[in-house]
Amino acid sequence: MESKFAHIIVFFLLATSFETLLARKESDGPEVIELQKEFECNGKQRWPELIGVPTKLAKGIIEKENSLITNVQILLNGSPVTMDYRCNRVRLFDNILGDVVQIPRVA
């Protein structure tokens, strides 16, 4: 029991001796990060009207409305994805019922 208490004390001492990674002075001001796209994509980019639509139907609509889209991925909501940006790709995130739950967009 004493060793557990000692471990807890050491943990709190170590934890309070470090600043958090996100800590900064208020006088530093807000930091703005500007993300740059290497290129602009042509055609329709977003389909907010497809929320709640079955993913297979949504896939067909996207391919019909933007012929430059050659890669429509259907993924379960919360699935890990790569962060690279491709003008020919749209990801459809669905739920277990097979309906679109996030706004499909070129990514």
From Swiss-Prot:
Signal peptide (from-to): 1-23
Proregion residues excised on maturation: 24-36
Record keywords, A-Z: Protease inhibitor, Serine protease inhibitor, Signal
PROSITE patterns xref list: POTATO_INHIBITOR (PS00285)
Superkingdom to which the source organism belongs: Eukaryota
Swiss-Prot/TrEMBL GO biological process terms: response to wounding
One MF annotation (Gene Ontology) recorded for this entry: serine-type endopeptidase inhibitor activity
Chain positions of site Reactive bond: 83-84
TM stretches of this protein: none
Quaternary data: Heterogeneous tetramers of similar chains.
Role, per record: Inhibits both chymotrypsin and trypsin.
Protein family: Belongs to the protease inhibitor I13 (potato type I serine protease inhibitor) family.
Additional remark text: Mechanical damage (i.e. insect chewing) to this plant results in the systemic release of a factor from the wound site. Within the leaves it induces the cytoplasmic synthesis of proteinase inhibitors I and II.
Name of the molecule in the record: Wound-induced proteinase inhibitor 1
Originating species: Solanum tuberosum (Potato)
